[in-house]
Amino acid sequence: MKLHKITSIAVIMQIKKILATLLFLLLTGYISAQSVGLVLSGGGAKGISHIGVIKALEENEIPIDYIAGTSMGAIIAALYSIGVTPDEMLAMFRSPEFASWYKGEFEKGYATYIYRREPTAEMVGVSLTNEKKNKLGIKLPTSLISPFPMDLAVKQIFASSAAVAGYDFNKLMIPFRCVAADIVNKKPFVLRKGDLSSAVRASMTYPFLFKPIIVDSTLLFDGGLYNNFPWDVMAKDFNPGFIIGSKCSGNAAEPDTEDILSQLENMLRVETDYTIPQEKGVLIDILLPGVSIMDFNKVDEIYRVGYFNTLRYISGIKSSIKRRTTQKEMLKKRMDFRTKTLPLRFADVHIPGSNLNDSEKEFIINTVKNNSSEVFNFEQLKRGFYRVVATENVGSIYPDIKIRKDSLFDVYLQIKKNAPMRLSIGGNISSSSLNQGYLGFQYNRFSKNPWRASADVNIGRFYSGLNLMLRQDIGIKPLWFYEAQFTA
């Protein structure tokens, strides 16, 4: 009996050891497999603080297995997903090129002056269109900032990486998600695949600042309108073991009678849930009370706030996440992905499904390609793109870039013609006798060899005059035209 009892105790002790070992293996297995998702809110220039968050996490070897963002958060998240380092992001946001992108200004060295008219006294101008038969309508601008520099920039940054991933956001260096706003159905639009640059461009399209774009037949605006902090998308799509959220913006403040942007924000935005359940992760709340959405001249100040704010959370994050990713491992991961990307070399230009006729398409394609059939690079594409914009014959032009089987790329241009007529008024109102009035009219005829005619009338006590002008562009390479003017 005594032997049997001792044997039973020994068996129980052995079972306990086995169970303890299994439990230890399960726990260590969970820890080693614990995945981490990073979610970045929108916030305009405040979103630069996310770069500081990423820098602090990387320095402390906190892994980032998935990343998602909205608006400015989508830009930072997408850059990280293709292997751009925090230091490289900072250099980009400090650059004069970035300033031209968000201001809508042509980059120096790319502006085309040969198509520009002589300056006039115009103060206000409206475009007139006859798109509806037998009806003349006014065409108002849809954005305050020219979208062309930003459109080209996102293509240059993201096109090759998207091709490497097979246009699947799960196959980027870091799997990625972003959110735009479907204003027709009034709901968030989650972007999981397709053209990465268009996904980013859609997510940061703040109403009235930037022109909206169409993705998958849906007109999309800034994702912050309906979901400014997509932690729910992160949880649903990736289900990471731990979520780190970086929040640099809140819900819309009370509207101000003197601030039209605050009024629009309250009209358009719905409230976002910024609360990450404690069992799912942690929220890094970054306060930037003196920074507005367009304060991109405060890059270093905003970055430092994000960086040092994150350091306050690091000990808690480390206790929740036992896995570590060394900087050497991150460097290898970046190099493995980035070395697969291809230089942007283009074979052809296409204009699918537009309201342009064949001669108009021919002019645009020849202008972009500089009347050449040879392979061309991104710099040549940019020059040709800006030449087309400078002609004032197109109201919108958005490039899509897709890889071919021969590892070259093709450009697909989404184009809408500009209104053919423009009416301008201006002048000078003075308490003295120096009053001056101006009235102008311009008509553009778009074709393979486009022409335009204009009439400008100035009326005043000291000067009155009439100027008539006719110009036609004949060649592209070399670029030449003829022009006739009459002044009275």
Report each predicted region and the residues it spans.
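Intrinsically disordered, low-complexity regions enriched in small/polar residues
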Residues: I6, L26, Y30-S32, A68, ...
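N-terminal secretory signal peptides that target proteins for export/translocation
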Residues: M1-I15
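Sec-dependent N-terminal signal peptides
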Residues: I9-A10, I18-Y30
